[in-house]
């Protein structure tokens, strides 16, 4: 079992956790429908960069 020999300080703990922060999703508004969607992804209506790419 891995058990540490010495206690880690609050500073070292914080440095380790510095990369754990979450970022917000990059959202865009579609020009044709005005729908909010993830960047570089097709909208629910099937539009990508203003063009219809998927027919439902």
UniProtKB/Swiss-Prot annotation:
GO biological processes: translation
Secretion signal, residue range per the UniProt entry: none
GO annotations of cellular component type: large ribosomal subunit
Region (Disordered) residue spans: 1-28
GO MF, one annotated term: structural constituent of ribosome
Keywords: Ribonucleoprotein, Ribosomal protein
Top-level taxon in the UniProt lineage: Bacteria
Keyword Acyltransferase applies: no
Bias-annotated ranges (Basic residues): 1-16
Similarity comment text for this entry: Belongs to the bacterial ribosomal protein bL32 family.
HAMAP family the UniProt entry points to: Ribosomal_bL32
Listed name of the protein: Large ribosomal subunit protein bL32
Organism of this sequence: Vibrio parahaemolyticus serotype O3:K6 (strain RIMD 2210633)
Taxonomic placement: Bacteria, Pseudomonadati, Pseudomonadota, Gammaproteobacteria, Vibrionales
């Amino acid at each position: 079992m891995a058990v540490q020999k010495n206690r880690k300080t609050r500073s070292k703990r914080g440095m380790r956790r510095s990369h754990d922060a979450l970022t917000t999703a990059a959202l865009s508004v579609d020009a044709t429908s005005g729908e909010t969607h993830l960047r570089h992804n097709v909208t629910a209506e099937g539009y990508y960069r203003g063009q219809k790419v998927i027919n439902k």
